């Protein structure tokens, strides 16, 4: 979902699907949701309510893709990350596309 931020990148689902290893994927669903239905096995699970406290767990060496189950939490998480992380870091909210994975 584009928010108008300069840090948001357009999302190319086909490219992402083939190159997930090029991204740090942050899954902001609750831990119980992730255990029940993992989507990306190499994703970092940081539930949205814990995100501000656990920012240091997110590597900054790759673009960041943020997702939840449907888009609401990932939009909020993307805004938090955009405000807290370096300006040159690409952050993409893939929440609205997650059901295609």
Positions of PLM-derived features:
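Rhodanese-like catalytic fold shared by cysteine-dependent sulfurtransferases
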Residues: 1-24, 28-101
